[in-house]
Amino acid sequence: MVAPRSRVLDVGCGDGALLDYLVHFKQVDGRGMELSQAGVNACVGIGLSVIQGDADTDLADYPSGAFDYALLSQTLQATRDPKGVLDQLVRIARRAIVSFPNFGHWRMRWHLLTQGTMPVTPCLPDAWYQTPNIHLCTIRDFQQFCAAEGIAIEQAIAIDGQGRVAPIRSYRWANIFGEQGLFLLSRR
């Protein structure tokens, strides 16, 4: 989804694995923002340009259109203000790429139905009382949110547990079988 030699901001970049890949294999001009000092240190240690920052408050400091892409990988559900963060992403970049765990996946539903407890999965490895996830959504929730907020979905992909990818628009059961949603967004 990321074009070679583009300007990229990876928000919530963690240890920098994705940003490092994009810098070395797609020759992007990559920058990162990470909340944890340990993550910033890991990124800087491998030569990445990363600052410590909070997506909920610090994205407002970037000028409009500063990047070609703003990435938010597996971070949206941990933000305090997902709407505000998404508004900032599509403001500071021509396109935003957002991925998140799909809380509508059939295994999640089945676990809640049969066990009555919040599931712990490879995609969501923390117990409910230890998780950073505070805003849970499904693929369908996210699509409805984007429509209501004037955010265009240019491409949408559901990813299952084996890494298989299916386009969401042509895959009727994406909300049930996709463990993760991956969206390419822009401002309408």
Language-model region placement:
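Class I SAM-dependent methyltransferase SAM/SAH-binding core
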Residues: 21-58
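Conserved SAM/SAH-binding loop
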Residues: 15
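A short SAM/SAH-binding and catalytic strip from SAM-dependent methyltransferases
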Residues: 69-80
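Conserved beta-strand/loop positions that form the S-adenosyl-L-methionine
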Residues: 11
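S-adenosyl-L-methionine-dependent methyltransferase catalytic module, highlighting the catalytic core
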Residues: 83-88, 95-188
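Conserved alpha-helix/loop element of class I SAM-dependent methyltransferases that forms part
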Residues: 1-5
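Short conserved loop adjoining the S-adenosyl-L-methionine
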Residues: 58-64
